[in-house]
């Protein structure tokens, strides 16, 4: 039984290998095609592109939106939202321990760019997006293709 299994695996591997062959493989002999251009950017964190997101929170009784590009997965049920502690939206997040993370599609880019360019301390951004209140009480953008309603567990400064 063990030999049949090994033979079947070998045959399957050969079939897959032959199915994945490409006629372009012979063209790769040309060394110019094998060279990729690289640029030395120095010692930087370069895990890009990151998804563009708009974070929503209630601040002083009004919805506020903040553009955030540093969002990542830190566990099977946890994400990390990284932003400067100087942002106006932080006070609402710290008070309520709630926020929404709204992915941005191409149609949303102009408004996302705008909310990322002005401070909620000086500008009312609550009407920039049509939204509804999520199950956890955070503002959720209606047009966003994917939304995460988040309850804050920890804040690191």
Identify the residue ranges that each predicted region occupies.
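Sec-dependent signal peptide recognition
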Residues: 4-11
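Active-site-proximal mixed secondary-structure blocks
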Residues: 24-67, 72-157
